Design a protein with these regions (language model features):
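N-terminal glycine-/serine-/threonine-rich phosphate-binding loop
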Residues: 1-22, 28-31
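Short, glycine-rich nucleotide/cofactor-binding loops
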Residues: 13-23, 52-53, 99-103
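Histidine-anchored nucleotide/phosphate-binding helix
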Residues: 24-37, 42
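Short internal beta-strands
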Residues: 40-46, 123-126
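N-terminal beta-loop-helix "entrance" segment that forms/cooperates
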Residues: 48-61
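A glycine-rich helix N-cap at a beta->alpha junction
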Residues: 60-96, 100, 104
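Mid-chain, well-packed structural core segment of small domains
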Residues: 86-136
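Glycine-rich, aromatic-bearing surface loops/beta-hairpins
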Residues: 124, 137-140, 144-166
Length: 166
């Protein structure tokens, strides 16, 4: 009943972390919204910018240190102290990417292209861009604009809008 009275019309997602699991949470939710016909805007800030930076977007890693939810294949526990060992993060990241490829999960770039093709809008944070000394040309070509936080919030205004932080 509530769906008929107040359907979701717009979703604004803020991606502030650059790990595989955080970036993919953003991309999966954004793509799902686009597929449902919901107006979709993504704002990449701080380390989330890695997902839309040409030099970084194919090199995202899994956060192994301090991740109590981390599991090994088959669901076996992964002691967080193992994440500090040299090569573990790279190995876990490679395994995760391999598993994702085997089950046809799109790459970061493919997801961004799908979201953009479906009408989703992708933005970068001006403050984080300045902080990391990035320029618009450093970003994936589908980034619509570099905005301040205030500018992004203006785009997120209106009834039946959700703002999601990942």
């Amino acid at each position: 009943m509530a769906k008929e009275e107040f359907p979701l019309k717009k979703v604004c997602i803020i991606c502030a972390k650059g790990t595989i699991e955080d970036v993919y949470a953003t991309l999966v939710m954004a793509n799902g919204a686009v597929m449902e016909g919901i107006e979709t805007k993504i704002f990449f800030t701080f380390f989330g910018l890695d997902a839309i930076t040409k030099k970084q977007m194919n090199s995202l890693h899994t956060g192994t240190v301090g991740n109590p939810a981390m599991r090994m294949p088959g669901g076996l526990p992964f002691p967080t102290i193992l994440g500090m060992l040299p090569g573990v993060e790279a190995g876990v990241s490679a395994m995760m990417k391999s598993t994702m490829a085997k089950i046809d999960i799109p790459t970061v770039k493919e997801f961004l292209e799908m979201i953009e093709a479906g009408g989703g809008e992708i933005y970068a944070c001006k403050l984080a861009m300045d902080m990391f000394k990035l320029k618009k040309e450093d970003l994936w070509e589908g980034v619509k604009d570099v905005l301040t936080v205030g500018d992004f919030y203006e785009k997120c205004g209106g009834l039946q809008t959700q703002i999601i932080f990942t």
